Amino acid sequence: MSVMAATAVVSPQAEASESWYLALLGFAEHFRTSSPPKIRLCVHCLQAVFQFKPPQRIEARTHLQLGSVLYHHTKNSELARQHLEKAWFISQQIPQFEDVKFEAASLLSELYCQENSVDAAKPLLRKAIQISQQTPYWHCRLLFQLAQLHTLEKDLVSACDLLGVGAEYARVVGSEYTRALFLLSKGMLLLMERKLQEVHPLLTLCGQIVENWQGNPIQKESLRVFFLVLQVTHYLDAGQVKSVKPCLKQLQQCIQTISTLHDDEILPSNPADLFHWLPKEHMCVLVYLVTVMHSMQAGYLEKAQKYTDKALMQLEKLKMLDSSPILSSFQVILLEHIIMCRLVTGHKATALQEISQLCQLCQQSPRLFSNHAAQLHTLLGLYCISVNCMDNAEAQFTTALRLTTHQELWTFIVTNLASVYIREGNRHQELYALLERINPDHNFPVSSHCLRAAAFYIRGLFSFFQGRYNEAKRFLRETLKMSNAEDLNRLTACSLVLLGHIFYVLGNHRESNNMVVPAMQLASKIPDMSVQLWSSALLRDLNKACGNNIDAHEAAQMHQNFSQQLLQDHIEACSLPEHNLITWTDGSPPVQFQAQNGPTTSLASLL
């Protein structure tokens, strides 16, 4: 907060006429905005105000200014807290002093949270909310702040209640824009809680409010982006990759519209409308991110790579000027997705270096590490499968299961752990227990179309290894039906090649060929290196069995090329120091196993 900004709202002549006060304030602001800032001198100027035994209004405002400067520009949180507590205490005794009173409450509760004194922040915010009902801007802002605090504590029920209160208050004070923000925020939390029956009517209402609201074009489009992001993520959570396409297209058009609008100062007539969801640049990265999520699920991995590169470039530019924690969250989620892409496309060494980079990013923030530790271990488990370290894969997935409460992630991990047990071939008891928990025919734990299709595939794979071919075909045809319905290309390719293998074993070469050829075409399009390797081996054997020697030779050559590429990448990955991360299953990742100079990826120059 600018220390001079306060003078713009100082109405009593007692403040404005004190020339000593204005002079000290001017010096303080000069030192604060110097390049580099001279914070110590700024603080001295503000402290000097107290030497003049100022009136209560100046005293309270100066405590707020000192607390703000110390909080934002120094590590002296104790002194910042003392000044903010005094500002809050004194300002409550002064009538019509809302700007200082509620700014102090907001900043002080933020500081309490930073010091892990959440129990001090909550009653402070509740008191401020209680006495701010005649000040729409501050009442809404404080409700948002307390809801966010509850969300960070994973108390989503209390957060939803507060957002509901905020939505009703915004309606009463005639702010449909801020009502939509409260409702969309509540919808986001309901999606996180998987309360889908409550989400659908709420999103329908939000859609109507957004379309009917006539106001600033950037604010209107930002509401539409928020609304569409919720719809897209809802579809993606449900694994409905094809159904989401119209919404995703609308979202991409919407962000293009926003990028053409001028960032004029928004000065709404209703003070309750003085909010925005995200800066335009952040929204742009978010749209890239959901596009990457869609491309990853659909199996368009080159497209996922392209949008990841664009998003990471944008993020690096933004992070030079903006320390907002959401940017680090975006970066982490992007890396999580691109790592999975690398493992599929046969770039294990690069994936491993990016896992190391992810570890470093998460270690910069305890909250980031807490929120993404399960994903980190899951990615390491997937890497372990790719380099055939099955014991380590099991340890990583078991650790990830211990750390997650997210049902979709839990199901994803269990599905992959089941594939590890199938490959090991001697873990039948554990495997049966796992398969019972992800039975796609009965009480499947999540509503995700994609994960249910994957569960059918895992059942088919297990039946194949046990020689129960008719049962395997039933499961795989179910996977094919589901994956074709939603354009899940990787699952389609995997199911086709496994069906082709079954028909080959049964001696039905024609039917096998009908499965393997499209599997190979689809795997090349993705590109999925493992399925290409498997398909080329089958094509070689099929053509040899049918006496097609030229085709058999061509397929053998392809298989040899894929084998060489994968072997070379395997050797490179296992020789990296980061490979030792596969043994990490507890606490923070060991620093000695991480690359100290960052990854040498295609993005090295940008990162």
From Swiss-Prot:
Pfam families documented for this protein: Cohesin_load
GO cellular component terms listed in the entry, alphabetical order: chromatin; nucleoplasm; nucleus; Scc2-Scc4 cohesin loading complex; SMC loading complex
Subcellular location: Nucleus, Nucleoplasm
Keywords: Cell cycle, Cell division, Chromosome partition, Mitosis, Nucleus, Repeat, TPR repeat
UniProt xrefs under InterPro entries: MAU2 (IPR019440), TPR-like_helical_dom_sf (IPR011990)
Keyword Protein biosynthesis: no
SUPFAM superfamilies linked to this entry: TPR-like
TPR repeats: 102-135, 374-407, 453-486, 493-526
One record GO biological process: maintenance of mitotic sister chromatid cohesion
Keyword hit for NADP: no
Superkingdom of source: Eukaryota
Gene3D superfamilies assigned to the protein according to its UniProt record, in alphabetical order: Tetratricopeptide repeat domain
Sequence similarity: Belongs to the SCC4/mau-2 family.
Physiological role: Plays an important role in the loading of the cohesin complex on to DNA. Plays a role in sister chromatid cohesion and normal progression through prometaphase.
Protein name, as recorded: MAU2 chromatid cohesion factor homolog
Organism the protein comes from: Xenopus laevis
Gene name, Swiss-Prot/TrEMBL: mau2
